[in-house]
C-alpha cells in the first residue's frame, strides 16, 4: 500500500503537472482533491504538450483511474470542454471518476467573481475570475449545489431558483448589472449534466477500495502552499486547501492512509497576482529567467513575477504539509547566470526571522537575507544523474535541501519526461 501526495511549495506553477505525470506512470489511481479550473497544468505525453485545468494528469494513461474529488468545484461547461479537448487527440476518458459530492460552479458565480474583483479597485486580490471563490463561499454558507443535485432535475431546479433570487438581487442592486434567467441556466446545465452523468460516483469508495487493495494512489494538488486559504499569504490566496492535509477533506481518504508527500519547487520562485514577494527580481536577471523559463500563466497568460529561491517559503511549506521529499524543477533555466542567490531568512528591524510571517504588513517590511552561490555555464538538459551535474549546480540544489530540511527526491532539467531525474525512490 503506497499513497503519495504532490504539492506545490511556493505560489503554484512549480511544475507539479510534470512531476505528477511522471509519477502517474507507476500509479494505479491519480486524484485531484481541491480547486477548480483556475489553475492549469501542462503535461508532456509521448512528446506532445497538453494543457489541462480540471482533469488529473493521469488521464492519458488508459489503465489509470482518474478521480475528481469532492473538494473540487466544477464548472460543467469547462469540464465538458476539457473532455472534448482530450477526445480530439484520440484519448478515451472512460477512466475518469467524478465525485457526486463536488460542488458546481454556475454562471452567477463567475459573474460575481468578476464584479466583486472590479469593485475592490486598488485592493484587487488577483482572482482568475473563474467563479472559484464564490462557489466555495456558497459551499461554506450551505447553499451550494453539488454534482448529485445537478443530476436530479427537480432538486437542481429548486435549489437554482432559490439561489438565483439572492444572486440576481446582489448583481442588480449592489453591482448594478444584469442577473440571470432560471430557464436559460436550467436548460443548459441539465444538458451538461447528461454528458457528465456516466462519470459520476462516490469517489471516496473508489479511492479507499483501491488503497485497501494495495494499489498505488497519487494525489495531485493544484496551486501551492502559499496560496492555501489557511497557510498562505491571505487574502492573496485561493479559496481551498492545496496543502497535503487538504487531501483528507477533499478526497474522503483518512490521514492514516497518506504515506509520502512530495513538495515541488522551482529552482527559483515565481508568482502570479498581487501580494508580497520578497525575493522578486525587477531587473534584467528577472526578465532573463522569465523568458528562458517561459514564465507565463497557463490559465491567464499573464507574465509571472520572478525571484530568487526563498528557503523561508519552502520551509513553511515543509512544516504545514509534512513534506517528505523535494522535487526541484527548471534547474536548467538558471544555466548561464554568473551568481545565484538563495534567501536564507528575513530581516525585520534588525531581527532575523526564519519562519514565514502571517502579518502581511510586517512581511512587506522585511528584507531578504541572501546567500550567494556561483552559477554554472554548462548545458545541463542532457544530465540524467545527480553526480553528472556540474559541481556548482549540484552544490546549489544540495544547499537548497540543507536550508529547507527536505531530502532531495527528484530534480528536473527540462520539460520532457526523460529530463526528470529520480534521486530517491518515491513509492517505497
Swiss-Prot record:
UniProt binding sites for GTP: 12-18, 40-42, 304, 330-332, 412-414
Active-site residues (renumbered): 13 (proton acceptor), 41 (proton donor)
InterPro entries, alphabetized: Adenylosuccin_syn_GTP-bd, Adenylosuccin_syn_Lys_AS, Adenylosuccinate_synth_dom1, Adenylosuccinate_synth_dom2, Adenylosuccinate_synth_dom3, Adenylosuccinate_synthetase, P-loop_NTPase
Pathways per UniProt: Purine metabolism; AMP biosynthesis via de novo pathway; AMP from IMP: step 1/2
Chain sites annotated for binding substrate: 298-304
Function in brief: Plays an important role in the de novo pathway of purine nucleotide biosynthesis. Catalyzes the first committed step in the biosynthesis of AMP from IMP.
The protein, known as: Adenylosuccinate synthetase
